[in-house]
Regions:
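Residues at the C-terminal ends
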Residues: 34-35, 141, 171
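Short aromatic-enriched loop/helix-cap "lid" or pocket-rim segments at secondary-structure transitions
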Residues: 53-55, 139, 189-195
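C-terminal catalytic histidine-bearing segment of alpha/beta-hydrolase fold enzymes
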Residues: 175-270
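Short beta-strand/loop motif that positions the catalytic acidic residue
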Residues: 148-150
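Short beta-strand-to-loop junctions in surface cap/lid or active-site-entrance loops
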Residues: 1-7
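Primarily recognizes the serine-hydrolase "nucleophile elbow" in alpha/beta-hydrolase
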Residues: 21-25, 65-142, 155, 160
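Conserved loop-alpha-helix segment in the C-terminal half of the alpha/beta-hydrolase fold
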Residues: 162-173
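Serine-hydrolase catalytic machinery in alpha/beta-hydrolase-like enzymes
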Residues: 11-82, 241-242
């Protein structure tokens, strides 16, 4: 909880990336949100599943499903809304990479109906360099206002599928702002020198129809029916190991924090 301010507090629901928790990164963002007057609830999707909190999914990017993470987030939202210290009308999510990608599901009413249950609507979302590899073809959006920040040179989570999904959400009536951080790699807000290494990437733009469960990979044209065929071959060509680059500058971090601060002010009237 923040050192100053009045109850009930606005809340940032902090969503970890696939890299797990790092005090040098996640801890600093949490302190920053506290200084802005926000209570923080961060979701640890790893420990209870016997996974390393520090290591997350690792470079193999495996061990836990998106649906499991989304279910955890909805549970956290319900918990926060039931706490009298928290203002249920002023809750936002924040996450980078996988933590941002999970928010793509939160923007869809279909996922909310499948995994969320009652009373999980919140005020907004902030996604940095999100993963947008699996989306609803024709989404019916939820009401939260989203800020999506994309790295111009992100070679881990490609910006294009996110722009495509954001456009479809906007056409369906969603309140979503998309901005590109010039020259930015993946995780540009690390405030660490850029470095490259190999990791599993999901360079996919897979869209599905919830009514029929027909899905297609937009990039290579592969089509499947999830109910009949399973999920396998639609992913075959777009999930692979590749060179990724992470890191950025203090200037990029400062710009990002100011943009996040403005979105919070606009969304919550603070």
């Amino acid at each position: 909880f923040p050192a100053e301010g009045k109850r009930p507090y606005p809340l940032v629901l902090y969503l970890l990336s696939s890299g797990g928790y790092g005090s040098w990164y996640d801890g600093e963002w949490i302190k920053w949100f506290n200084r802005q007057g926000f209570a923080i609830l961060w979701v640890d999707q790893y420990t209870a599943r016997g996974m390393s909190l520090d290591g997350g999914l690792g470079t193999k990017q495996s061990g836990m499903s998106d649906a499991s993470y989304v279910s955890d987030v909805y549970a956290a939202i319900r918990t926060a809304k039931a706490d009298p210290r928290i203002d249920p009308e002023r809750i936002v999510t924040f996450g980078m990479s996988w933590g941002g990608g999970v928010q793509m599901y939160l923007m869809s009413q279909w996922w909310e109906e499948q995994l969320g249950g009652d009373d999980v609507t919140i005020a907004g979302h902030i996604a940095l360099g999100p993963a947008c590899y699996l989306t609803v073809e024709k989404p019916v959006p939820t009401t939260g206002k989203m800020l999506m920040l994309l790295g111009e040179k992100d070679n881990w989570n490609q910006p294009k599928p996110c722009r495509n999904y954001a456009k479809r959400l906007q056409q369906a009536g969603a309140s979503i702002t998309v901005e590109t951080v010039k020259g930015a790699n993946h995780a540009w807000d690390f405030n660490k020198a850029a470095k490259s290494y190999r990791a599993v990437v999901y360079h996919c733009d897979i869209r599905f129809d919830p009514k029929t469960m027909d899905a297609r990979n937009v990039e290579d044209g592969i089509k499947v029916n999830f109910s009949r065929d399973g999920w396998g071959k639609v992913w075959d060509k777009c999930v692979r190991k590749a060179k990724v680059t992470t890191g950025g500058t203090k200037k990029q971090l400062n710009w990002t924090r100011e943009r996040v601060r403005k979105h919070l002010a606009d969304t919550l009237g603070m």
